[in-house]
Design a protein with these regions (language model features):
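Conserved catalytic core of two-component sensor histidine kinases
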Residues: 15, 42, 49
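N-terminal single-pass transmembrane signal-anchor helix
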Residues: 1-29
Length: 126
C-alpha cells in the first residue's frame, strides 16, 4: 500500500516560508494608508492653487474665503487655512487621520508656510 500526501515536516516548512514572506511584506504595506492620506492633502492643495489662480484671473486679487473659490476638500482633509497678501497667498491643510506630518502647505509669491525652501506652488508636508 503506497501512501499519498504531505508529511508533517513538509507542511511545517510551507507554513514557515509563508510566515517569512508575510514578515517581509507586511511592513512594506503598513504605511500605505498614511501615504494615501498625505497624497489626498497634496492633491487638495494643488486643486486649491488652480482655484485661486482662476479666481485671480477673474478678479485680479486672491481670496482667503474658500466659498469664493467653490472649493471642496476631500473627506477628512481640513478646510484650507488661506492667508492672502498683496499678490501673494499661502494655505495649509491637515488630515484627521494623520499625525506625522502634521500639515501640508503651499505658497504662491511667498514662502511656503511649512517648508521655507519649497518651490512656489508645490505642496509640501512636514
Amino acid at each position: 500500500m503506497s501512501k499519498k500526501g504531505f508529511t508533517l515536516i513538509e507542511l511545517l516548512i510551507v507554513v514557515v516560508i509563508i510566515g517569512i514572506l508575510a514578515a517581509i511584506a507586511i511592513p512594506k504595506f503598513a504605511n500605505t494608508k498614511q501615504k494615501a492620506y498625505i497624497t489626498a492633502m497634496k492633491s487638495d492643495l494643488r486643486n486649491l492653487v488652480t482655484a485661486e489662480e482662476a479666481y485671480f484671473a477673474d478678479s485680479n486679487a486672491y481670496t482667503a474665503t474658500v466659498t469664493n473659490l467653490k472649493f471642496q476638500s476631500t473627506t477628512s482633509v481640513s478646510t484650507p487655512a488661506i492667508t492672502t497678501g498683496t499678490g501673494a497667498w499661502y494655505a495649509t491643510v491637515s488630515h484627521s487621520q494623520v499625525t506625522t506630518p502634521a500639515s501640508c502647505g503651499v505658497g504662491i509669491n511667498t514662502t511656503n508656510p511649512v517648508v521655507a525652501g519649497a518651490s512656489e506652488g508645490e505642496p509640501v508636508c512636514q
